[in-house]
């Protein structure tokens, strides 16, 4: 079956977020020739995306399986553990979810994630090596991801992350935290958001 390069499906795990969200929003606004569909594991995410006025499907639904068979591009931000059979032959655009100097993917040598990571590379290595394009933000990150994820240089795309470069206004949730919490305009807010570490 020939895949349609004008149908792109997107996923960011169990939410509508991250680099896939920002590229999804950008393509919807600037490339009407491309059909965009947000793929979901859970009904609450699907319903949320639909309330925004966008097309969304559950992976395990008839509509989801049909669109997975037709789509030409699958946009993600991680090395997925599961590739549904309907995705065979699709081009994967991995936007990753950030940069950092920690060991990831193939270079994880301990902790509870090690076994899961090893299993997914045994199961999906052919897909990662042959069907996945990988976004990197700099020459330094090229080296990092080639080493950490085993990606060949010809599959790298050097560009900025969509969430950092897309400047279109997006109205997916209210952003005025002070107003939501009933705080004054000069109230100071502190955020503590550590990255998970297993070492």
Which functions belong to the PLM regions below?
Residues 1-5, 171-191:
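Nucleotide-sugar donor-binding and catalytic loop/hinge architecture
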């Amino acid at each position: 079956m020939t895949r349609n390069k004008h149908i792109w499906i997107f996923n960011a795990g169990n939410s509508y977020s991250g680099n896939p969200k920002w590229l999804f929003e950008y393509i919807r606004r600037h490339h009407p020739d491309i059909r965009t569909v947000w793929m979901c594991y859970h009904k609450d995410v699907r319903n949320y995306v639909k309330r925004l006025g966008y097309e969304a499907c559950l992976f395990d639904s008839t509509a989801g399986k049909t669109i997975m068979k037709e789509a030409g591009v699958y946009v993600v931000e991680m090395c997925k553990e599961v590739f549904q059979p309907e995705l065979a032959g699709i081009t994967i655009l991995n936007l990753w979810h950030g940069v950092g100097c920690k060991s990831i993917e193939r270079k994880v040598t301990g902790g509870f994630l090690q076994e899961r990571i090893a299993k997914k590379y045994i199961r999906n290595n052919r897909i990662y090596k042959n069907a996945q394009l990988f976004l990197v933000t700099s020459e330094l990150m090229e080296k990092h991801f080639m080493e950490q994820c085993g990606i060949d240089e010809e599959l790298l795309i050097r560009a900025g992350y969509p969430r950092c470069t897309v400047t279109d206004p997006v109205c997916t949730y209210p952003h005025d935290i002070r107003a939501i919490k009933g705080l004054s305009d000069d109230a100071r807010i502190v955020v503590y958001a550590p990255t998970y570490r297993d070492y």
